[in-house]
Amino acid sequence: MAKDPQTPTDEELARAERDAEPQPGDATDDEVELEGVVEDVEASEADAEALENPEADALAARVEELEQALADAKDQTARAAAEAQNVRRRAEQDVEKARKFALEKFVKELLPVVDSLEKALESMQEGASEVHREGVSMTLKLQLDVLAKFGVEAVDPQGEPFDPQVHEAMTMVPNPEVEPNTVIEVMQKGYLLNGRLVRPAMVVVSQAAN
């Protein structure tokens, strides 16, 4: 005799319903499929962004070109400014030199007059007219004052060490009383114009005695 099927209890029915409900941590087939589609879309977008954009590349290249041109222009401007400053400085130096030494030729022409006046004053005997002596002396002083006004100064190295930069040795004489290479006589004074030698002093220089 066949047995009647057993009727499920309420507890068994509740358990079966719980098992049939999806759990929070479990994904359904539809959800899994949807997630796959989303991932594919995101990957496609990333790939699209990674693809080269010809217009963007051209724009970036143009920007780089302009930046380089700007840097070159700044460099050229700086170089031009430096060159202009150098030119201006050289021009100022040339003007200063011209101002200082424009009188050099004229001074050289006047120096023989000064030499003549000095020799005339030295050669006058004590019995010479005081008026004449005073006249020559005043003329010489006036001449020297004018030269000094324009930056001319005499080189009178009597008793000083011989300096070939500003002295010209006419002869050397043994002299045990002074150090060798000492100027013992000035035959003709030298002159400087604003610190530049116009004429060396002609001198006699001592040398060691034999």
UniProtKB/Swiss-Prot annotation:
Keyword presence, Transcription: no
Entry GO MF terms: adenyl-nucleotide exchange factor activity; protein homodimerization activity; protein-folding chaperone binding; unfolded protein binding
Pfam families: GrpE
Annotated spans, Disordered: 1-31
Biased amino acid composition, Basic and acidic residues: 12-21
Domain of life of the native organism: Bacteria
Keywords per UniProt: Chaperone, Cytoplasm, Stress response
Gene Ontology BP terms: protein folding
Chief location of this protein within or outside the cell: cytoplasm
Cellular component GO terms, alphabetical: cytosol
Compartments it resides in: Cytoplasm
Family: Belongs to the GrpE family.
PANTHER family the record matches: GRPE PROTEIN, GRPE PROTEIN HOMOLOG, MITOCHONDRIAL
Job description of the protein: Participates actively in the response to hyperosmotic and heat shock by preventing the aggregation of stress-denatured proteins, in association with DnaK and GrpE. It is the nucleotide exchange factor for DnaK and may function as a thermosensor. Unfolded proteins bind initially to DnaJ; upon interaction with the DnaJ-bound protein, DnaK hydrolyzes its bound ATP, resulting in the formation of a stable complex. GrpE releases ADP from DnaK; ATP binding to DnaK triggers the release of the substrate protein, thus completing the reaction cycle.
Subunit organization: Homodimer.
Name of the protein in its database record: Protein GrpE
Organism per entry: Chromohalobacter salexigens (strain ATCC BAA-138 / DSM 3043 / CIP 106854 / NCIMB 13768 / 1H11)
